[in-house]
Regions:
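Membrane-embedded alpha-helical bundles of multi-pass transporters/translocases
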Residues: 1-497
């Protein structure tokens, strides 16, 4: 977890520098919108195979001692992913103007909440150019992500956990050294540099693995390759709906007043700091562990591991969620309000963070529970649930955006609220199905952990509310940092006495 915390420190540092340089400007809106397309390509082609199909299959081969077949499978998956990503990214670069004009400017999704920014030729040109630059990233991330899965399958987590920090360092280099002469394009080039370092930092760990071999093969003669494709199919469908939901949110925000896309990006990034440090660090380590327990025919061990992870997760995610909700304004002010990031930008980001923070627990639990399904070679259940809930999210996003506009509220907050509601429902349904699948979740222990976290969280919330009332006229440094320290202290005391 320490490596993930280091990664989030660098991520936060890069966000602070980006906000100082670009704020919630048209240029940064274009950068975030352009970044969405490469991210979708990577998630569909590489991440789906990695999370649900490749790691469990590869881990199973390692557990059975068939290392050569495992490396043939790994080589085949790397080769296929690289070929597909190069082809898709090349075509996307050629048709970038069409993608921006007809996808990011989709008129049906912007109906009723669109402003004049859609007719801004500068915003359009920024987005097209940034999209073409960033389309190199999915190729780099595809290879790097598979290396991460290979290394994690050997129960080695340090170097892969440090990889996200490299991406943030690349962005920092882009802001400090490239943006002064290249403007927003400097950030895009820094992003590519970070993507390259994301893979390079994992090479030392890869070279230390036993019997590492690379084969020039597409694995057509391997039944495990077909198994990966079989498992990947439903997962790709699920990822497609998740990414469609994310794309719809970006499209809606792209048509809202200037700064909405950036505000969504900053606020979601702040929510993701505890989510990555707590939930994703646990989930990445959990998948190989769950897969090995299933391969050894010990589902009861997996049930115990999952229950323990959920209890630990709730004890950390609940106070993190409440802390972000209460301290959102001083935290955003302290971290971002400087340079081109003004008071209005702070209000926009804090408004979205209010709703995103409410969904932190849901996002965190889904990260863990979905890994349990993948380890059981069941990709259909989480995909089906994800498709239904993400479709619900799209509907809520469109409906809430109109309602918020009608009430005179900043409409980008509607997208965050819809996301949190849909994710909470997804969490509940996945917990119901996994409980049936593995014959329980040690419910009494899990419920006890939940109630203790909620009780201590309630005490912490009362303390933070009083703190904010008392410290209103004081320095934002004192309010934010003191609030965090107070929250941690009160929560720990509360946990010890409930």
């Amino acid at each position: 977890m320490f490596a993930f915390i280091i990664g989030q420190v660098f991520s936060l540092a890069s966000s602070v520098l980006i906000s100082w340089k670009f704020g919630t400007s048209v240029e940064y809106d274009a950068f975030i919108a352009a970044n969405k397309i490469p991210d979708i390509i990577y998630q569909l082609v590489a991440a789906g195979a990695l999370a649900s199909a490749f790691v469990p299959t590869f881990t199973g081969l390692l557990t059975r001692g068939d290392r050569e077949r495992g490396w043939k499978l790994a080589s085949a998956v790397v080769n296929w992913v690289t070929i597909l990503l190069i082809g898709i990214c090349t075509l996307s670069a050629i048709f970038s103007p069409w993608i921006v004009r007809n996808v990011l400017n989709a008129p049906l999704l912007n109906h009723g909440v669109v402003d004049a920014s859609l007719a801004d030729p500068l915003k359009f040109q920024y987005t097209v150019n940034l999209l073409r630059i960033q389309l190199i990233a999915p190729i780099l991330f595809g290879i790097s992500g598979l290396l991460m899965g290979i290394i994690n399958s050997h129960q080695s987590f340090l170097w892969p956990a440090l990889a996200p920090a490299m991406l943030s360092i690349g962005k920092i280099v882009g802001v400090l050294f490239l943006a002064p002469s290249m403007d927003i394009y400097g950030l895009a080039v820094g992003f590519l540099l970070g993507a390259l370092m994301h893979g390079l930092i994992q090479l030392p760990a890869l070279t230390k693995l036993p019997m590492v071999k690379y084969f020039f093969t597409l694995g057509k003669d391997l039944p495990e390759t077909r198994e990966v494709v079989r498992l990947m199919g439903p997962r790709v469908l699920g990822v497609a709906f998740v990414q469609l939901n994310s794309l719809v949110n970006t499209i809606i925000a792209y048509g809202l007043p200037t700064g909405s896309v950036g505000a969504i990006g900053y606020s979601f990034g702040l929510m993701m700091i505890p989510e990555i440090a707590i939930a994703q660090s646990m989930a990445i380590a959990a998948l190989p562990t769950f897969s090995a327990q299933v391969a050894k025919g010990k589902p009861e061990d997996m049930r115990a591991s999952l229950s323990a992870l959920l209890r630990g997760l709730l004890l950390l995610a609940i106070p993190a969620s409440l802390g972000l909700i209460f301290l959102r304004v001083p935290l955003v002010t302290l971290l971002y309000q400087r340079g081109t990031f003004d008071g209005h930008s702070t209000q926009m980001v804090a408004w979205a963070l209010l709703f995103y923070a409410a969904g932190l627990v849901g996002h965190s639990v889904v990260e863990i529970v979905s890994r349990a399904f993948y380890a059981l070679h069941d990709t259909k259940t989480p995909v089906f649930v994800g498709v239904v809930m993400m479709s619900f999210n799209v509907i809520l996003s469109l409906w809430f955006a109109g309602l918020f506009t009608r009430f005179g509220w900043m409409p980008h907050g509607a997208l965050a609220l819809a996301n949190s509601l849909a994710t909470f429902l997804e969490m509940c349904v996945l917990l119901f199905f996994i409980r049936r699948k593995i014959s329980g979740l040690e419910g009494r222990h899990t419920l006890d952990g939940l109630l203790r976290a909620l009780a201590a969280g309630a005490v912490m919330s009362a303390a933070l509310w009083a703190w904010l009332q008392w410290t209103q006229p004081l320095s934002v440094w004192l309010v934010a940092i003191g609030g965090v320290l107070l929250g941690v202290l009160v929560y720990q005391i509360g946990r010890a006495h409930v």
